[in-house]
């Protein structure tokens, strides 16, 4: 076994407890890393790898003052960082200075810096598996928000974690590998382990309303936070239980397909529904807006409550604009409260808190001035927190420094002892300021200066040419420079001691007073969190009102079953088009129109129309107004989509398999109150397979599910289903031919499309003319009823000499004696398995799935 120095042995002992993290080991002004940590960190951070002890121990380090930037880099890549500090004074230490890990920073526990997005929560999740389902707990350490839900299926757990963007998931070491793998891959999150779910006194207030299962799930998360953060978690709020049945369910694929919070291609906010809507003025409001989009309401009374407040704010333009200006000056109260509880709040944070509280009376008055009772009631609930404002006004200067060590935080008059020390310091400095003039007059040296530096303290500086003018015995030489000498006098030394003592006392007392002030502010955390909730709701509601007025949205109405949208518009496409004319479209469903079969050429707008209907429904159910001239909608409990064709690279599934899985998800879980969007189902396989599957799915949804369904297809043969299925109607996207080119009118009309215009689309894509002409010839032959297409390239002539073997033409097949085909063993097994199926007992979906599985075996 290798022999190490006591310091390296100390490092190894601490590292053994944090094997899944980089250990930032404090040595003087640096955080050092050793061994494998050093090798990996030097690559990830692109810093120099060195060594110690004769090259036997790899080593790298980062400066203490700039460590946060390096920590953020590692956290953004999914790593954890354990901060190990010196916890005793090196001057008084016997042997190796004592060190301890004071915090474990993980992707889910970031409290500050660039790793914390202003308008997004930073949730950490915990998942527990039970016999009858899964417990899910969520906590945002930066805001104090806590949520929990019991969820039946793992795919819904994944969808929820994806929605909130949790970067870390805490699980038990006993959770099965398959579930852990699914969570890690599907959620793309760091997995951490915690086995304690013990109830401790400080957590009782958080979990008092939870069931046993949710209590266990949240306490596992709480134990992990307590173990890693090693400080107060007093700002954590009582856990709010959310039931998936109380909000519209939108699965993971549908959230991506509809681009609710980020676009599919660039993964950016721009181009998403969130981007369109975000007119919030506070970070808190921005985060709440995202939560509302992720969880549309299904209770009509809650939807109407939001609608009513949006209507009020729309009706009072000037008051709304004043409200927006006031909200703009409110800082992030939730995260400020979190920093207070966490103990890392600085004086500028408290000044931001003070400036925010200054806006609250005006905001309350603005809302109360609105004539509607709902607005007055909301205003009456707002707590001004004026006692906290007065405390901060009395205690803090307006522009305090960033760090506590710089001092000058606490106002004069706040503490008598501090005033006394400051008077002593000021009097001493005034005396020194007068000293320069007195010494000049006394010595007759006009260039004499009184100065100060941290090494020698106060001094009197005289140029070397004038030193002979100084009175002997009165001045003591302190420092010699190239062209001057520096001296002190007994009086100067005495005053210096008084000033430095006063400043030391000021620094110590200011720190004590600030720490005490921080503890006083902690008492207000619950009130601040409630105020933050009220401000964020006002912000999200004014955001809806602002967008709705700016973009000419109308207030939707709700019905039991009817969809009646006049002049509906895709909200995001309309904004992106800006001043270009957007073609609105109607949508009528219900009363014999549960399924709309949409035909029309590529690029004509079928997918946009389908997404438009889903987004209008979501906007309506989050309480916003919608882009239409009139809208009556049912309340949808779920939205399912199958739009786009992208392989699932994470799980290695093909386009077609993803298509089938998404179709299965809709058909298994949709109800008659759901909305289903199927775009080009069946295109991932051969024509006849695809057409058969598409028809089977349409029939199954029509006969057994009853959900409102928009089904676009290129299979024009399916339009005959209108005469066979009572609730299905054909609609098409109108296009016209003009001088040999196709013009897309983007208008939805009743009936089926008369042709597909596929070759015209290829022409628009500027395929070579030879290909376009040849395709047109083939199409003409096929449309004439011919089952054979004349080859464009003639076959190469055969030679009569058998011994002269020539390369076959591309279209020629070498003739071979016909023999009875012999099946391979695996092919025979597939046929036998196919024969064993009882097709009469299978649903269309089960039959499709089995067929796909057999196809993969061949």
Curated annotation (Swiss-Prot):
The keyword Nucleotide-binding applies. This protein is involved in the repair of mismatches in DNA. It is possible that it carries out the mismatch recognition step. This protein has a weak ATPase activity. ATP binds at residues 600-607. This is DNA mismatch repair protein MutS. Keywords: ATP-binding, DNA damage, DNA repair, DNA-binding, Nucleotide-binding. Belongs to the DNA mismatch repair MutS family. The keyword DNA damage applies. One of its GO terms (biological process) is mismatch repair. GO terms for cellular component: cytosol. One of its GO terms (molecular function) is damaged DNA binding.
């Amino acid at each position: 076994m290798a022999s190490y120095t006591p310091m390296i042995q100390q490092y190894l002992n601490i590292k053994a407890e944090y094997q899944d993290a980089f250990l930032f080991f404090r040595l003087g002004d640096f955080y050092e890393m050793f061994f494998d940590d050093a090798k990996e960190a030097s690559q990830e951070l692109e810093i120099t790898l060195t060594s110690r002890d004769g090259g036997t121990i790899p080593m790298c380090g980062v400066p203490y003052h700039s460590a946060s930037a390096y920590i953020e880099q590692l956290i953004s890549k999914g790593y954890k960082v354990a901060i190990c500090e010196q916890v005793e004074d090196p001057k008084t230490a016997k042997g190796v200075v004592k060190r301890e890990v004071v915090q474990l920073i993980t992707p889910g526990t970031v409290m500050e810096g660039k790793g914390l997005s202003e308008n997004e929560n930073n949730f950490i999740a915990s998942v527990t598996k039970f016999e009858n389902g899964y417990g899910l707990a969520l906590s945002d350490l930066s805001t104090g928000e806590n949520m929990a839900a019991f969820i039946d299926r793992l795919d819904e757990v994944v969808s929820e974690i994806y929605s909130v963007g949790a970067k870390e998931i805490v699980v038990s070491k006993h959770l099965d590998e398959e579930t852990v793998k699914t969570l890690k891959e599907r959620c793309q999150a760091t997995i951490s382990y915690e086995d304690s779910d013990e109830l401790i006194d400080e957590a009782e207030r958080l979990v008092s309303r939870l069931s046993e299962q949710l209590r266990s799930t949240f306490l596992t998360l709480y134990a992990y936070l307590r173990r890693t953060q090693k400080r107060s978690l007093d700002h954590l709020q009582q856990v709010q239980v959310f039931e998936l049945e109380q909000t519209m369910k939108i699965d993971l694929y549908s959230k991506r397909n509809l681009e609710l919070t980020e676009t599919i291609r660039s993964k950016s906010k721009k181009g998403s529904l969130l981007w369109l809507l975000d007119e919030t003025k506070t970070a808190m409001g921005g985060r709440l807006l995202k939560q509302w989009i992720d969880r549309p309401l299904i209770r009509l009374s809650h939807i109407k409550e939001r609608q009513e407040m949006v209507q009020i704010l729309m009706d009072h333009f000037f008051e709304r604009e004043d409200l927006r200006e006031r909200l703009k000056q409110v800082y992030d109260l939730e995260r400020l409260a979190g920093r207070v509880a966490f103990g890392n709040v600085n004086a500028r944070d408290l000044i931001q808190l003070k400036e925010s509280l200054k806006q609250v009376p005006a905001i309350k008055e603005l809302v109360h001035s609105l004539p509607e009772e709902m607005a007055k009631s909301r205003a009456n609930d707002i707590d001004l927190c004026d006692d906290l404002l007065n405390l901060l006004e009395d205690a803090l200067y307006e522009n305090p420094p960033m760090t506590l060590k710089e001092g000058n935080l606490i106002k004069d008059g706040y503490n008598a002892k501090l005033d006394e020390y400051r008077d002593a310091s000021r009097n001493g400095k005034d005396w020194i300021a007068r000293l320069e003039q007195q010494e000049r007059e006394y010595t007759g040296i006009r260039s004499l200066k009184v100065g100060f530096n941290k090494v020698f303290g106060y001094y009197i500086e005289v140029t070397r040419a004038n030193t002979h003018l100084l009175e002997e015995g009165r001045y003591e030489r302190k420092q010699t420079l190239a062209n001057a000498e520096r001296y002190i006098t007994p009086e100067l030394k005495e005053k210096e001691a008084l000033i430095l003592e006063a400043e030391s006392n000021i620094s110590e007392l200011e720190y004590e007073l600030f720490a005490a002030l921080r503890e006083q502010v902690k008492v207000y955390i619950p009130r601040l969190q409630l105020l933050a909730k009220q401000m964020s709701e006002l912000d999200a509601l004014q955001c809806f009102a602002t967008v709705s007025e700016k973009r000419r949205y109308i207030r939707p109405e709700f019905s039991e079953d009817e969809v009646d949208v006049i002049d509906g518009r895709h909200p995001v496409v309309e904004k992106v088009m800006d001043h270009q004319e957007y073609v609105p479209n109607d949508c009528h469903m219900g009363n014999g129109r549960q399924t709309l079969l949409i035909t029309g050429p590529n690029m004509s707008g079928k997918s946009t129309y389908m997404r438009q209907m889903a987004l209008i429904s979501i906007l309506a159910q989050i309480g916003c107004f919608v882009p239409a001239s009139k809208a009556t909608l049912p309340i949808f409990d779920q939205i399912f989509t199958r739009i786009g064709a992208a392989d699932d690279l994470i799980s290695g599934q093909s386009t077609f398999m993803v298509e089938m899985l998404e179709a299965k998800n809709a058909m298994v879980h949709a109800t008659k109150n759901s909305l289903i969007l199927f775009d080009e189902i069946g295109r991932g396989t051969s024509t006849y397979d695809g057409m058969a599957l598409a028809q089977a799915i349409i029939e199954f949804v029509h006969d057994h599910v009853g959900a409102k369904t928009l089904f676009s297809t290129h299979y024009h043969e399916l339009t005959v289903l209108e005469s066979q299925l009572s609730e299905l109607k054909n609609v098409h996207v109108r296009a016209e031919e003009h001088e040999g080119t196709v013009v897309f009118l983007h208008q939805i009309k009743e009936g089926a499309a008369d042709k597909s215009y596929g070759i015209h689309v290829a022409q628009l894509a500027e395929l070579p003319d030879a290909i376009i002409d040849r395709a047109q010839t083939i199409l003409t032959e096929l449309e004439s009823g011919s089952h054979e297409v004349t080859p464009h390239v003639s076959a190469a002539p055969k030679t009569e000499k058998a011994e002269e073997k020539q390369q076959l033409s591309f279209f020629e097949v070498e003739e071979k004696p016909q023999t009875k085909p012999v099946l391979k063993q695996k092919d025979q097994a597939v046929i036998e398995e196919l024969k064993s199926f009882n097709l009469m007992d299978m649903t269309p979906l089960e039959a499709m799935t089995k067929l796909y599985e057999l196809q993969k075996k061949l």
